[in-house]
Amino acid sequence: MSDEIARRIAQGAGRAPADLVIRDARLLDLVTGDLVDTDIAVCGDGIVGTYGEYAGTRVIEAEGRVAVPGFIDTHLHVESSLITPHEFDRCVLPHGVTTAIWDPHELANVLGTAAFDYALQAARETVMDIRVQLSSCVPATDLESSGARIEAEALRPYRDHPGSLGLAEFMNFPGIVAGDPACLAKLALFAGRHVDGHAPLLSGRDLNAYVAAGIRTDHETTGPAEALEKIRKGMTVLIREGSVSKDLRALAPLLTVATSPFLAFCTDDRNPLDIAEEGHLDALIRMAIGLGVAPLAAYRAASLSAATAFGLADRGMIAPGRRADIVLLDDVETCAVARVIAGGRPAEEALAAPRTRTPAPGRGSVKAAPVAPEAFRVAAAPGETSVIGVVPGRIITEHRRLTLPARDGAALCDLAQDAVKVAVIARHGAPGMACGFVQGFGLRRGAIASSVGHDSHNLCVVGADEADMALAVNRLIALQGGFVVAEGGAVRAELALPIAGLMSDLPFEAVRDALHPLREAARGLGCTLPEPFLQVAFLPLPMIPHLKITDRGLVDVDRMRILP
């Protein structure tokens, strides 16, 4: 170790050539906002010199490109990219994301602590620096059937793992505020460590209590007033822009040079097609600047503020002593990424090098019996029916009341009101199924089914035809998970996700290409949502207001109860 320190000192002082020099860069100083012409000297995986000229064993000519610190995605689920961590690395690192904070919550709900074992090992095999936060709420609630239950003692063996960054999104904010013993046990176990939050619309004294419990960050903030209250109370708000949850437009006015130390970026859930077409964190930076955010504020939020929020003091700036995570840009305003250096290595070379790939667990995880069309019958009730109201671009849903047609004692879909059926079928070995209605998909025919169903990942199907709903679900079971579009008694498009019913074992390019016909098939049913499959996937999430559905029934999230 002392030899390595001596090497860094010698190279930083210019007495020895640096391992790598990025020559003729324009460094965006995140302290002052200045653009400074300089070389950047790198020794091993660390920066040893800036603000001057250096000689190097290897030289990369920046040719006047702007150098910014590598981007940090502060909260994501790799599983939601539908690909393995190794493919996620190939897909996302070229977009400038050199650090990702992964909550393997989706895998954990299916596999239990085996998800942590896999995530921590896979993170050692990626070029991108992936840090794992341990899932805090498995299951999210007791209002659904999950594949696993993880209490405080099960978390203890992983707490001090060098790849573990702390406790991931604490979804059970009502439990924390009420002093639930199970919640308190987890918080006590991680006292002094980073604990990530999940507190949509929480405010006032309840928010005070939540923050006082040690919660430091939150990514479920959807409005500027909510965000301002949270940062004033000491939280860092992680501005989210994923494939479904899109909060950046609403929160961008709050992101200024003054507030940027208290705001960062995250994607949460973003699929390979959106990454290919729009980008990753580079897309968020581009969008923020396009909405009027000062470039200094945007790039600071994407790196330095994120590093500070999560205690990653070794990164977030291009400065001596920091990790050599560097992004070269052709253009600052559009965040046009030209080249990425990750831990001192050019990303394109590191990604091409042979690497170990730990096999992913979770095959054979869909343990559900086939269903018949009659299973989707919903008994008619007098008066109005509770219907889930989908809000495009949001995972918050509305609790709507509609009068639906009926025949022979059964409630029917009403296409004139855009009301179709939705069902959740348990898939972890125990029986369970619930049916209801949803408004906002625009379906005129057929069905869309998914084995991705946050957070317990039971099977979820939305459809205007019971026979097609049964066909789509049964095809999911045969595939051992995935996405299916069915119409007129035939499967129109599908993508198998055999790893825990959540991830593909294919290269990201193949998954990206498979999403095109799936979206087209969904549009062919009349679907008006830009990302129908992830929208389906959030219908069973009973921690996000206001009305959801699980395998046990419709859930009034505001009262945390199953509707009769």
UniProtKB/Swiss-Prot annotation:
Q: Which domain of life is it from?
A: Bacteria
This protein's UniProt keywords? Hydrolase, Manganese
GO MF, one example: adenine deaminase activity
The EC number(s) attached to this protein equal 3.5.4.2
Q: Which reaction does it catalyse?
A: adenine + H2O + H(+) = hypoxanthine + NH4(+)
Family annotation (InterPro entries): Adenine_deam, Adenine_deam_C, Amidohydro-rel, Metal-dep_hydrolase_composite, Metal_Hydrolase
Q: Which Gene3D superfamilies match?
A: Metal-dependent hydrolases (3.20.20.140), Urease, subunit C, domain 1 (2.30.40.10)
User: In the UniProt record, does the keyword Magnesium occur?
Assistant: no
Q: Which family does it belong to?
A: Belongs to the metallo-dependent hydrolases superfamily. Adenine deaminase family.
Supply the name of the protein. Answer: Adenine deaminase
